[in-house]
Regions:
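A residue-level signal for conserved active-site and pocket-lining positions in enzyme catalytic cores
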Residues: 50, 148, 218
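Active-site histidine-anchored catalytic micro-motif
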Residues: 1-29, 55, 59-172
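Short, surface-exposed, polar/charged, turn-prone segments marking secondary-structure boundaries
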Residues: 36-39, 116-117, 141-143, 184-188
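Conformational coupling and interaction surfaces
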Residues: 1-10, 136-139, 155-286
Length: 286
């Protein structure tokens, strides 16, 4: 929201699966409420809509869900009055973009999906000890993932679990660099502090570092090179899109379309830019 090169068209509050420990009950409404709070803090209320996503998950790979967010994605993708590239940044499930594709398949070559989620690819990375096969964001709506991977030709940039887990920010950095940066910095630091408390209540320990795993959504869209725009400072490969199984694992598919899978991310640029923008905002300079 603080990136001057980006024209934010909408923010969509999405669901959490039933039974998810983070689910507050009316999950979509709470997501919209949380987003509106951030939008208000950055002084952008009314500049773009904050919309509700679907209230539920896909039951099969052919039937779309309905929501204001889904319809907005379709309308935005089908615009013919702009040459700007359109990115759909997904930091949770793939529910909205999956249903948008089912309702209007022509959006596939008119946007790029940047998704934080999915299991490690066996040929690229090992799975962390104790990590479940069913990665958290995919677990929110596995069928949506199957729609995008197995039944669409959507242009997909994937940041799988091994990659987003590397976006570590220490508690000391949180307290000394983020928390002092005005109302917004204090709010973000407090929200991350709540995670540590919640983990402790479950008998665990959050340790000294937390993965700010959704941050690559900014890195890979707003922070591209000025010439021949691309994500030059982060490593990625093109991979034949595997078949996504119901258990969250992949089955190789040599005939799959090419998808971009990210590995090593430019944390220096990503977190340096985050702190710099929060400093500018706190000083009233953006």
């Amino acid at each position: 929201l603080l990136s001057p090169s980006v024209e934010v068209r909408a923010v969509i509050g999405t669901h959490l699966r039933e039974g998810d420990p983070w689910n507050p009950g009316d999950d979509v409404a709470e997501a919209v409420k949380a987003a509106n709070k951030i939008v208000e803090m950055v002084g952008q209320t009314g500049q773009y809509p904050v919309l509700e996503g679907a209230r539920g998950i896909h039951q099969d790979t052919k039937t779309p869900l309905n929501s204001a967010g889904i319809d907005f994605i379709i309308a935005e993708a089908m615009r013919d009055d702009t040459e700007l590239p359109l990115y759909v940044a997904c930091g949770a499930s793939l529910t909205e973009i999956a249903s948008a594709y089912l309702k209007e398949p022509r959006i596939a070559d008119r946007l790029t999906v940047v998704w934080i989620g999915g299991h490690e690819h066996e040929s690229l990375a090992e799975t962390a000890p104790g990590a479940p096969d069913l990665e958290y964001n995919l677990h929110q709506d596995v069928v949506a993932g199957q729609i995008v991977f197995n039944h669409s030709n959507l242009r997909l940039w994937q940041v799988p679990r091994d990659s987003y887990r590397s976006c570590l920010y220490s508690r000391a950095e949180l307290l000394t660099e983020l928390q002092p940066l005005g109302e917004l910095g204090a709010h973000l630091a407090a929200e991350l502090g709540r995670v540590a408390v919640w983990v402790g209540e479950l008998g665990g320990s959050a340790g000294e570092a937390y993965a700010l795993g959704d941050s690559p959504l900014v890195l890979l869209t707003a922070l591209q090179t000025a010439f021949e725009p691309d994500t030059a400072s982060s490593s990625w490969i093109n991979l034949a899109c595997p078949t996504l199984l119901a258990n969250g694992l992949y089955e190789p598919n040599l005939n799959g379309r090419q998808i971009r899978v990210y590995g090593l991310l430019d944390n220096r640029l990503m977190f340096g830019d985050m702190i710099a923008k929060l400093k500018l905002h706190a000083a009233g300079l953006n």
